Structures are given as structure tokens and as C-alpha cells.
């Protein structure tokens, strides 16, 4: 979340910057709450000073043998008023904190200003989409040729937006995840993690999914115990590993990676991408997280994005990189690059990775800090996250870009070591 000092000292500037994201900050409400907070705080401080003075007078009066009953009554009255003032102050602060939890991050000055995805800026492209000399099939039709993709069986088990993978296609899906993990751990310096797929609410609040986006999550209610949520991304579990910690400067940067299933309700996606594997309730993803010194986070974002790009380059899949505009960035990001891979059947690029610098936004929620050797004091770290990559969408891209006229699929060269001698999926 944002630093509350910004709302006290630069409220209108913050409101103007948030407006570029399409977010309307209720300035009047915040000003009203701040005025009440200051008034109550001033009153309680005055009462505390008066109470201290009265308490001192009691001792003096008692030493002189004077009647202390009126003074005692005054002190008791003030104690009651102080308790009421503290309750009121706590209520005001809780309301301000609640507002803070709903406010998105401030965009970096380098982020293009815009209202929607139409205003995103293309940064670069890699590779050239293949010109097929036959009528191409989409991944659903290709899956039917081999029998390796079965959406009907999945619907029988779980309903819409699920898939059953079989045989060589299931193995190809696994190969992709293994290849990604091996690349990031072997060449990019990440440490592999296996984390819980179920987390509690504080973890999701720490990374910004709660309270604002609860409808996008799958929740497991437990009577008498804390609720569980299925993770929407391993960003949640990986980033929260540093919650409440004070890291030594020598530990930074932390580079963490995990391969997990992800679970999303897709509450706002009704009618979109209903065919195939593009938008699923359950999908696998390899997630990269970095925890860095604040001065190095923008440089780290470029490196994180390059790590995700390397996966696509080695798979020889054409892609482009977009700098997201202010109106299209995620809730917690100060700057985001999206990677979009070429999907032949749709004749366009589709998102396959989102790489974001969240600044100290998540760290403040989680109280994740490092000890700055220059000051000797704990300070907030910066956190970054990025898909490296979404496994299901990468499978879609491989199936479609490596298809042959008969519906068979060539196995990309870098995946052959994982395929047990299978070079063509028929």
C-alpha cells in the first residue's frame, strides 16, 4: 500500500497521479478523516497532559493532608475520556487503513499514460511469425488429432474452463515446466521453491489481492478456523516468504522461482476465451520473484523481463514486449512489461507473461525490510514478480507454431531431452 505520509502531505498530487490510472481517490473523505484524526489526537494529548498534572497534584495534596477526592474524581473522568478518545482514534485510523488497502500503486514517471490496453506501447519484437502453406488448426483441433486435449472429459469432472491432457501432450506440458525451471535456476540465478497452494488471507493482503479482488479467488471456508484461499499465482506464496523479515544487505537480491498450479475464478471474463486453454480456472505457471534494494528495482525489472523473454527465444516462438500504460497496469505495479506470444490461429499476439516492479507497495503491506548498511536502519525492500512463463499458454503457442499439415506437432529442439525420444506428436 501507499505510504500514509503521502496522503497527509501530498494528497492532491497523489490523486492526480492515480487519476492517470483511472482511479478516483475520494479526497474529501480522506481530508475529513484526517481533520477528525488530528482533532481527536490533539484533544487526547491535552487530556493526557492534564491528567498527568492532576496526578502530580494528588501526591502534593496528600502530603499536605488535603482532601484529594475532587482531584481523584477529575483523574478518573479524564481516564474515561482518554479511553473514549483512544477508541475513536483507533476507529478513524482503521477507516484510513481500510481506504489505503483499496488504493493502487502510483505509476512510475516512465510509464506511458493511457486509459486502456489500446494505449500500451510496443517496446520490441523478436522473431517472425511463420507463413504456413496449409490451412492451420487451432490448439483445440490439434489436440483432437492426437487425442491429447480433452475438454469434454474435463467438463464432466469440473465444468467449463478446465482441460484434461493425455499422453505426449501431457508430457509436453510437463517438459515445458521442467525446461523453464531448469533455465531459471541453471542460467538466471533463481532458487527453486515448493510452496503451499493454500494460503490464508494475510498472505493475499500482503501481495494486494485482498481485500479488493476477493471475487477472483477460490475460497475454502472452515468452521472455527481461518479460511483458506487457493493461490492465484505463486507470487503470493513466494513474496510472502519475506513478510515480517529484516534481511541483511548481503542476502539481496533474492531470486525465487516456483512451478505451481494457479486457480482463478475469472469472475470478470464471462464470454471471453471460452474455447480452449487460453483462460482456465486451473493452470500451471512458473513464477519468478525478486526482492531487491530499492535503488536497483528498475534495473531488476529489465533483467526479470529478459529472463522471461529467454524462454520464448529458446523455444523459437515469436513474441513482442509491451510497456503497459497507466490505465492497464495491475493494482500493485509501478511499472509493467507484458510479453505476448504469436498465436497463429488468432493471427495476433496474446499475453503469456507479465513482469512487474511493485516498488515498496507489497513490502509495506507485509513489513518486509532490509537493513541499509549506510544508515544501519531497517527500510522497506522492493519486490518484483513475473511469469516465466504461463505453462498452458506456452503449450498453446508450441502446438500452433510447430504444427504440420497433417495435424502432427514437431517437438521444439530444447524440449527433446525431456520427451523420452518423442520428436513428433501425432
UniProtKB/Swiss-Prot annotation:
Gene3D superfamilies on file: Bira Bifunctional Protein, Domain 2 (3.30.930.10), Serine-tRNA synthetase, tRNA binding domain (1.10.287.40)
Top enzyme class: ligase
Compartments in which it is found: Cytoplasm
Pfam families linked: Seryl_tRNA_N (PF02403), tRNA-synt_2b (PF00587)
Primary localization class, coarse: cytoplasm
Residues annotated to bind L-serine: 233-235, 287, 387
GO molecular function (one): serine-tRNA ligase activity
Keyword line: Aminoacyl-tRNA synthetase, ATP-binding, Cytoplasm, Ligase, Nucleotide-binding, Protein biosynthesis
Swiss-Prot/TrEMBL GO biological process terms: selenocysteine biosynthetic process; seryl-tRNA aminoacylation
Binding site for ATP: 264-266, 351-354
EC number, UniProt record: 6.1.1.11
PROSITE patterns, alphabetized: AA_TRNA_LIGASE_II
Pathway field: Aminoacyl-tRNA biosynthesis; selenocysteinyl-tRNA(Sec) biosynthesis; L-seryl-tRNA(Sec) from L-serine and tRNA(Sec): step 1/1
InterPro entries: aa-tRNA-synt_IIb (IPR002314), aa-tRNA-synth_II (IPR006195), aa-tRNA-synth_II/BPL/LPL (IPR045864), Ser-tRNA-ligase_type_1 (IPR002317), Ser-tRNA-synth_1_N (IPR015866), SerRS_1_N_sf (IPR042103), SerRS_core (IPR033729), tRNA-bd_arm (IPR010978)
A GO-annotated cellular component: cytoplasm
Catalytic activity entry: tRNA(Ser) + L-serine + ATP = L-seryl-tRNA(Ser) + AMP + diphosphate + H(+); tRNA(Sec) + L-serine + ATP = L-seryl-tRNA(Sec) + AMP + diphosphate + H(+)
Record note on domains: Consists of two distinct domains, a catalytic core and a N-terminal extension that is involved in tRNA binding.
Quaternary context: Homodimer. The tRNA molecule binds across the dimer.
Family assignment from sequence similarity: Belongs to the class-II aminoacyl-tRNA synthetase family. Type-1 seryl-tRNA synthetase subfamily.
Reported function: Catalyzes the attachment of serine to tRNA(Ser). Is also able to aminoacylate tRNA(Sec) with serine, to form the misacylated tRNA L-seryl-tRNA(Sec), which will be further converted into selenocysteinyl-tRNA(Sec).
Protein name (Swiss-Prot/TrEMBL): Serine--tRNA ligase
Species per Swiss-Prot/TrEMBL record: Pseudomonas putida (strain GB-1)
